[in-house]
Amino acid sequence: VPKRRAQAEVMGRPGVSTGRSNAGESPVLKALSQVAADERVRAAEAAVREACGELRWNEALRRRWREARAEAAIRGAIASGGVEGAVVSAEVLREHVAAGSLTEAATGDPGLDAVAGLWRAGSRLVGWMPDLVGRGRPVVPPARSLLAMLHRDVAGPLAAGGRVGLEEVGVPRTGRIRVREGGPGAAPQEEELAARLEGLLELIEAERAPALVRAAIVHAEMLSARPFTAGNAAVGRLLVRHLLVRDGVEPTGTAVSDLYPGRVPGAYAEAAGAYASGTMEGVAAWVVWQAEAVLAGVQEAQRLCRAVQAGTWRAG
């Protein structure tokens, strides 16, 4: 991939086909494979797979994996909300979840509403996860519906609070509709926007894609292409969790990879900017950053599992 075309070839910018080549190989998969072959990316993926393999056999997940997944959804919502500026304690969210008081998009507390939306989206992901012990394997909706459903959960509270229009919830941008949030670089419009969205949908559904690279690029495209007017970064982080579970990299569904962006926001922005540069160097740097976020999420999952096993996870 020529240096300045790395991102374009992955995501189908104007002039770059996302269809099948004469040999039957998808250009998207070819570009992803080239990113995955980078030495730093290979090392990062190996580290992620090793850490996730160790997590898979945590003793707490033998019988209490459902509780662990539910707690991960709470911790993920708290962490992701913090990235978006909504600061709510895990204890407060747990209390509302236990009381069943989060059925409405607006409670009068904008911070709680935002985090509750993220929790609803995370809980939806849990419902799509295969059983960790057993044979249950729920049907996951196609990519376009998947994006719309997650965005409705995330952006519903924004609409209820008057921050976005109802017509923007779950509906991707088209034409020259502008975004309401910042991100790395200028958000695409018109033909480029349509091409980036189609490339994103293809990437989510592509078979045999390198898993870590796929999850990282999907996240980065949500940040840089910004297919919705608002809530793109939060949906991107949710998609990382979904894809790593679906593709078998992190089958437990307990890694809280949302923690890392909140702990080191400067590194998050810098890595996203590197991706948006469009160079192979920048794309690889972003994938390595995503691997670091997953590793931090696995560490949190190990702590979560210890707390679940000890019966103390509701205390923090």
Where are these regions (language model features)?
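FIC/Doc superfamily catalytic core
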Residues: V1-G316
